[in-house]
């Protein structure tokens, strides 16, 4: 796996003074109810504000793969907290393949958020998956989503997990990440 880097080629996990960042991951549902959005935005912002207060000299990085729903909600809140909170985007697969998940305004929003991120990383194929197999909806693609969830858990010191109370057993969803 290659080291993550920003557009200028630096490693986003290293601050100018070589301070170790506090890495915050996010996982949750894609279909956030409209009536819950404002409350969830406030809750995520409160987490960032609290962390900035407790660790004022520590860089904060949010890891978000920018899926619709929770990932983008947290990413937008993080971007509103710049420069204290920076956004880094681990992608579950090549960007062109991942973009097949999004249409119209959603695709435009994904590209806009990715363009505002500090950097991104396309994760390698999960063992046994093929570059053609992940292009179709199904188990190979689901394993890539699970892989990005595992990456976020492994790299994060804090995990923000939003759940609507509905149980699912989907591979790569919030439940399999947490």
Q: Where is each model-derived feature located?
A:
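Acidic/glycine-enriched connector segments
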Residues: 2-178
């Amino acid at each position: 796996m290659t080291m993550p880097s920003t557009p200028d080629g630096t490693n986003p996990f290293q601050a100018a003074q070589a301070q170790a960042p506090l890495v915050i991951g996010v996982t949750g549902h894609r279909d956030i109810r409209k009536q819950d959005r404002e409350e969830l935005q406030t809750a995520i912002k409160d987490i960032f504000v609290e962390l900035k207060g407790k660790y004022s000299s520590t860089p904060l990085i949010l890891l978000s793969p920018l899926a619709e729903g929770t990932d983008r909600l947290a990413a937008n809140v993080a971007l509103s907290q710049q420069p204290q909170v920076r956004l880094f985007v681990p992608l579950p697969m090549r960007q062109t393949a991942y973009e097949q998940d999004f249409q119209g305004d959603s695709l435009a929003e994904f590209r806009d958020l990715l363009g505002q991120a500090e950097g991104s990383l396309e994760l390698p194929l999960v063992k046994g998956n093929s570059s053609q197999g992940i292009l179709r909806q199904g188990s190979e693609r689901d394993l890539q989503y699970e892989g990005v969830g595992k990456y976020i858990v492994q790299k994060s010191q804090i995990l923000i997990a939003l759940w609507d109370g509905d149980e699912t057993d989907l591979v790569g969803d919030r439940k399999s990440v947490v």
